Each structure stands twice: as C-alpha cells, then as structure tokens.
Amino acid sequence: MPLAAELKSRGLPITRSRRAIAEFLDASTAALSAIEIIDHLHSQGITVNKTTVYRELDILEREHLVVELDMGDGLKRYELSPRQHHHHLF
C-alpha cells in the first residue's frame, strides 16, 4: 500500500508536505536523509522547512512506517519499514 494511503487509513491527515514526503519515500531507491528530502521537495516547488520534515519523519517512525538508519556518516537516513518495504540500494 502506498505510504500516503497507509497514513490515511490510520486517520492521519494528508497535508501537502506529508503527501510529498510519503511519495518521495515510496519512489526512492535509497535511504534518504532529511536534507535530501528537503532538497527534493524544494526542487519540486514545495516549500517546506526543516522542522516540518523532521516532525513528519518522526510521525512516520512512531507509526512504524519508516525506520531510521545510521550509516556511520553522522546523517540519519530513513527508509520504508519492512512492512512497507521495497528494495533500497545502499
């Protein structure tokens, strides 16, 4: 199930930024940092601040829809949880 649909099924409102983050995570072939998500959204003309992206990622993690990864480079990255999983390249 697409991430945005899963959020909706859990009763969470689907804001423009939440939908955009969910769609980018769904389409990604790699685990993403918050900065990569912000840069992508800005390139798509979606204005979102860093706090919003971190808040959304926190919600997705609390709902067990994404997992936080530590790749050893000091950046936290996020990918779909195993229940939402599709293959990512590291």
List the predicted regions and their residue ranges:
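Non-DNA-binding regulatory cores of transcription-related proteins
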Residues: 63-90
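Short capping segments at the starts of secondary-structure elements
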Residues: 27-33
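Short helix-coil-helix linker/hinge
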Residues: 14-17
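Basic amphipathic alpha-helical segments that dock to polyanions
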Residues: 53-63
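A short acidic, leucine-rich amphipathic alpha-helix
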Residues: 36-42, 53
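Short, Lys/Arg-enriched N-terminal segment that forms or immediately precedes the first helix
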Residues: 1-11
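Pre-recognition alpha-helix immediately N-terminal to the DNA-recognition helix
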Residues: 19-24
